[in-house]
């Protein structure tokens, strides 16, 4: 490690200890050398003894800076790893940092523009940022070509070396987790860190975010439920993104929404519909739908429309995952735990040799108490969490796409019930799920599949005779190969039988010659000839096997 890395590591451990986070490590794991080392190098009393553990962890991550803040935010979605009191505190982490100098942002923009001055493309460029976060900040301007109001998102200068340095240290700490925590191996800390690193590096590429926003906008074009601002791809690069400026009420500002007469029930239900439409119709969902990224249009409060921004993190499910997920939800709310267990096995989420009866019993034990509440109060997100936690005990592998989905579902639920506490998520989602499943089976699905595949088969039809001929030829060649292999195996089997026979004769001759040589020396050369014959017979047998 370099001196700089050592200083940073010292600061990280010093910060953790100053917040008393060493109590996360069981005393039995703190061996005497570790305790002495801790006292000598990192002595620091817990300065926040009056605060609960979750709060202290949140404050420590905030003190360590943006990379750790975002890491904590990601960990808050992994409720399979942490108890609720810690996960809830991590969810409060705010990705707000001091903005960097506007002139420096202007230089970054001009660099992304190939050295052109800002006023070559933009008018009314604001040096003061509109918003600032750990990865990027946003400035307002107008497009010179058409006068439209836009926002320019620009990556922080020199953020990549900072991320790489801190990620290296996070990896080092992750390697210690299995040694320090009794359940550390099950938590798969290095896998969690790899997942975070990928998400973080994806956010550094604004071309990826631009493409995500364009796709989401296309999926909801002319939709009354969701509006996605227009992206101007000709102005975008890896370090800069230009998109339409929007005006709306933050979805968390319930007072402002009520003041303008927003239909809160419809708004909450539309949030659920938007989510399930993204997941099941489009297989492409916005996976960072926290309140800071969602606004509500000022127009038509009686028929409210969401506005979604910041598409840096998206998720997708394949057809099989969607089907299993929809059937899992329906089976769960029908309290058909056997079906839930079978679906987990059939999907490959748990190993195929899982004992279905034991798995069903475990699911029933964990999930049945949930139905003590009315259906309207049951949380979809916590249903998924309970299912995944139970499945993890049966060696369920981490499914990154399902983790993203669960996180997004928790956001959607939280926002929906904040807007309209009586929101019945199941009542809103059930018709959608049942309709989607019905659409995937039967005659309509068959006709749609035929339509989708028809161009492919029409294009390949002239090749069919040749493909049939090639298949027949390959079949003949395969049969010839099989016959040859069978013949070779038969010959080898015969030779092995002969070899065993010769080895037996050789052994008898050697043994007989040896006994005669010892007990009948008067027989002269006969014992020697017998032993020589035995050796020759062994050699012939050995040659037949080779």
Curated annotation (Swiss-Prot):
Its EC number is 2.7.-.-. It is found in: Cell inner membrane. Residues 124-502 form the Protein kinase domain. ATP binds at residues 130-138, 153. It is a multi-pass membrane protein. One of its GO terms (molecular function) is protein kinase activity. One of its GO terms (biological process) is regulation of ubiquinone biosynthetic process. Keywords: ATP-binding, Cell inner membrane, Cell membrane, Kinase, Membrane, Nucleotide-binding, Transferase, Transmembrane, Transmembrane helix, Ubiquinone biosynthesis. The chain crosses the membrane at residues 501-521, 522-542. Pfam families: ABC1. It is an enzyme of class 2 (transferase). The active site is at 288 (proton acceptor). Pathway: Cofactor biosynthesis; ubiquinone biosynthesis [regulation]. The keyword Nucleotide-binding applies. GO terms for cellular component: plasma membrane. InterPro entries: ABC1_dom, Kinase-like_dom_sf, UbiB, UbiB_bact, UbiB_kinase. Is probably a protein kinase regulator of UbiI activity which is involved in aerobic coenzyme Q (ubiquinone) biosynthesis. Belongs to the ABC1 family. UbiB subfamily. This is Probable protein kinase UbiB. The lineage of its organism: Bacteria, Pseudomonadati, Pseudomonadota, Gammaproteobacteria, Enterobacterales. The gene is ubiB.
């Amino acid at each position: 490690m370099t001196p700089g890395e050592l200083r940073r590591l010292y600061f990280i451990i010093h910060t953790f200890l100053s917040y008393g986070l060493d109590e996360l490590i069981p005393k039995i794991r703190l061996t005497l050398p570790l305790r002495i080392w801790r006292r000598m190098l990192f002595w620091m009393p817990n300065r926040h003894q009056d605060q609960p553990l979750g709060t202290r962890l949140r404050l420590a991550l905030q003190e360590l800076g943006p990379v750790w803040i975002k890491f904590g935010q990601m960990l808050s979605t992994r409720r399979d790893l942490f108890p609720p009191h810690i996960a809830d505190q991590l969810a409060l982490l705010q990705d707000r940092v001091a903005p960097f100098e506007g002139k420096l942002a202007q230089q970054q923009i001009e660099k992304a523009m190939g050295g052109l001055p800002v006023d070559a493309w933009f008018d009314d460029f604001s040096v003061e940022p509109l918003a600032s976060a750990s990865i990027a900040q946003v400035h307002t301007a107008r497009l010179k070509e058409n006068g439209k109001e836009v926002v320019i998102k620009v990556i922080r200068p020199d953020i990549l070396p900072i991320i790489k340095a801190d990620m290296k240290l996070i990896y080092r700490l992750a390697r210690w987790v299995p040694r320090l925590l009794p359940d550390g191996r099950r938590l798969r800390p290095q896998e969690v860190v790899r997942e975070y690193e990928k998400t973080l590096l994806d956010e550094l590429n604004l071309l990826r975010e631009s493409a995500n926003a364009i796709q989401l906008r296309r999926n909801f074009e002319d939709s009354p439920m969701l509006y996605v601002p227009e992206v101007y791809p000709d102005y975008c690069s890896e370090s800069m993104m230009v998109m339409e400026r929007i005006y709306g009420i933050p979805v968390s500002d319930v007072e402002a929404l009520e003041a303008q007469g927003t239909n809160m029930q419809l708004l909450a239900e539309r949030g659920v519909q938007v989510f399930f439409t993204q997941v099941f119709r489009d297989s492409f969902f916005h996976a960072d739908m926290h309140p800071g990224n969602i606004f509500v249009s000022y127009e038509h409060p009686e028929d409210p429309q969401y506005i979604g921004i910041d598409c840096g993190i998206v998720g997708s499910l394949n057809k099989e995952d969607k089907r299993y997920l929809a059937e899992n939800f329906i089976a769960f709310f029908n309290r058909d735990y056997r079906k839930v267990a079978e679906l987990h096995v059939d999907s490959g989420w748990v190993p195929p040799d899982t004992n279905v009866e034991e798995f069903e019993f475990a699911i029933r034990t964990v999930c049945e108490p949930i139905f003590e509440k009315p259906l309207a109060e049951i949380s979809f997100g916590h249903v998924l969490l309970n299912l995944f936690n139970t499945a993890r005990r049966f060696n369920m592998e981490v499914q990154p796409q399902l983790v993203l989905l669960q996180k997004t579902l928790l956001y959607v639920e939280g926002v929906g019930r904040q807007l309209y506490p009586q929101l019945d998520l199941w009542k809103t989602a059930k018709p959608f799920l049942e309709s989607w499943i019905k659409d995937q089976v039967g005659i309509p699905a068959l006709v749609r599949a035929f339509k989708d595949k028809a161009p492919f088969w029409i294009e390949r039809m002239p090749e069919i005779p040749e493909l049939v001929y090639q298949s027949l030829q390959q079949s003949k060649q395969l049969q010839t190969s099989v016959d040859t292999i069978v013949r070779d195996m038969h010959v080898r089997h015969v030779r092995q039988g002969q070899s065993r026979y010769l080895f037996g004769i050789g052994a008898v001759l050697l043994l007989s010659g040896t006994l005669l040589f010892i007990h009948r020396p008067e027989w002269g050369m006969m014992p020697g000839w017998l032993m020589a014959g035995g050796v020759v017979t062994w050699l012939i047998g050995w040659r037949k096997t080779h």
